[in-house]
Amino acid sequence: MPPKVKAPKVKVEFTPKYERNLTTKFKFGAHVGASGGVYNAVTNARDIGANSFALFLKSPRKWVSPEYNPDDVKKFHELCSTHNYNPRTDILPHGSYLLNLGNPDFEKAEKAYVSFVDDLKRCELLNIGLYNFHPGSSLDGNHEEALTRLATNINRAIKETNFVKIVLENMAGHGNLIGSNLQDIKDVIDMIEDKSRVGVCLDTCHSFAAGYDISDATKLEDFLQNFDDLIGAEYLSAIHLNDSKAPLGANRDLHQKLGQGFLGLEVFRAIANCKRLQNIPIVLETPIEKNETDEIYGEEIKLLEWLEGKSVDDAEYIEKRDQLSTAGQKERSEHLKKYEAKTKKNAKATASKRKTNKTIKAEERENDDDDIINKVTKKQKVTR
């Protein structure tokens, strides 16, 4: 009986469902997971056809995380090379949600700073050139002092690291958040010593929620011109791409799928045709429902690539715009009702407060009048 001959192993090449479009100059991508090893973020990005991607360098809700395994770092570099990602320009990690470098409590600010610098050093270990984070909050303290503390800590961090650019993200504007208006970001950048090491990430949902109307091509261009005039075009380092579940100026950070929110598809068509936004990471952070996977990002990336070259009066574009708008109609109505109810409640509270203040002032005037009468009466008695 002849010996059994083992069939040679055939290496099967994996073909991702969504191929990367390497002909476009736009770096459309998404925030991907890195579970199981930081290198997995690279293949996850490839699988959805992303030309850029974001990831968490460690748990965004923990202060301390284990150091990277050297083998994982090596594999990260190899996969970036294999799949044609330049870590210096194509990757935009997102900082921890715990960070608040402007905290008025010194010990808490220092705790945030240690975690912040750890993130930056992880970036440099991975040869990543950009690092995005939320600027924090002044809490109950003085806002200008919080901006100064934030800038001071960024300056410290720059001196402790070598090349990674620190990218401040604009915010939706609720509470005492830093960065809900562009002036905050300008004020911080003005205080940075090495300005080559700082940049800005504009989030479409945050901008709209903070009151900047960018819902069509003209309004987007006006907003970008405002950014250029106030801060400077050279500082625009990345875009976070999200529609908004909340109306304009609602100060709510509620991301929505492209075209289904109050922004609508038009701004994303405008972005996909805005040459000045080429060659920087444009990263999706749209919600993934329980019954969905990261593949939804692959679909939205292809939508963005399809929008490139489409005009506002293109019949296919109009059909897609209306289709997505209809899909989000129910949620928009629900959030509009909540917003209107909250606005009405706040207006009532403000009116009540004004009325109370008016009553207090009237009582104070009456007391002042009584004091004057008493003083006059006493003076008259003394004179007599």
Where are these regions (language model features)?
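Acidic (Asp/Glu)-rich catalytic clusters
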Residues: 43-49, 69-92, 119-127, 155-162, ...
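Active-site acidic/histidine proton-transfer and metal-coordination neighborhood
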Residues: 100-199
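Alpha-helix N-cap and loop-to-helix initiation/capping positions
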Residues: 64-72, 103-115, 141-152, 176-184, ...
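A general structural detector for well-ordered alpha-helical segments in enzyme core domains, enriched
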Residues: 41-44, 72-80, 115, 119, ...
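Active-site beta-loop-alpha junctions enriched in small/polar residues
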Residues: 31-35, 58-60, 96-98, 136-138, ...
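Conserved, mostly hydrophobic/aromatic
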Residues: 45, 94, 123, 131, ...
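Histidine-acidic metal/acid-base catalytic patches
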Residues: 2-17, 186-204, 208-384
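N-terminal pre-domain/capping segments
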Residues: 1-93, 101-121, 307-310, 318-384
